[in-house]
Amino acid sequence: LSAAVIILYGLFFAPPSPDPKQVNNNDQNKNNLQLNEAPKIEQNIENNKISRSEAINKVERILFENENIKGSISLEGSLIDDLIFKKYTKTLDSDENVVLLNPKESENGYYIETGWAINNKDIEVPNSNTKWEVIGNKLLTPNTPIKLVWNNEQNITFEKEISIDDKFLFTVNQKITNNTQNTYNFYPYGQIIRNLAPDVTDFYILHEGLLGVFDDNLVEEDYDDIKDKKYSVNANKGWMGITDKYWITSLIPESNKSFRSDFDYKNKFKANFIETDATEVRANESKTNQVKVIIAAKE
């Protein structure tokens, strides 16, 4: 699997040689008091342990489907948290399709979150409980992306356009429009959260757990290892994810953007990244960011 994903990343997502970094513009609004360091990603979500079907029906959703996968995206948090493999069954003699992703409130919660963080506590940013509004199309297919919008009380607009290909790739294009007279620094992030570890095969040539490639270096951490010790790394390119015997869920940050990635366990497993260079959004300005999500079978 690791080799396959490395090849996939190299073919489709490896960034070109980076341009010289722009000199930081220090002429920021003096009223904007905030740190210039990427904040920690903290989403403390309690496990309510309701059934999967209850959790799915509890919130509004956008359905998605292509030749290989189907499921839904929760409008509470814009979480990719319901995914079924259409071509794989739980056993050879079963008609029941494999379910990989589950809502956060179910016992076996397993989901993907993308968004923006900020060091300024006076500015609201979307979180896992934010109620997003759908604009236009309400069915996500390879031919029909969806658009989600949320406005905070400070008059800053957050948008997401989510698309899928005909296999296992989601592309999340995020946009911030600053309708205020101040300048703010935002930090794009993405994280995969899993409440419980799966039954592990414990076969020595097969890695199951958290993994990633950071500046061409492969990192593999078992579920038990992460319970004992957090792993952190800074990188200029790469990807990170969580893998089982047959399946993988992974995130690919935007090309040419430096980031910090953490593998952590605090009552649930997390593989995440946050860009370490702030996205400066000035008054009446818009900025964008892209995160790619691969949720795939190990074919």
What is the role of each PLM region?
Residues 2, 11-92, 97-100:
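Juxtamembrane extramembrane loops of integral membrane proteins
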Residues 61, 65-299:
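Soluble non-transmembrane domains of integral membrane proteins
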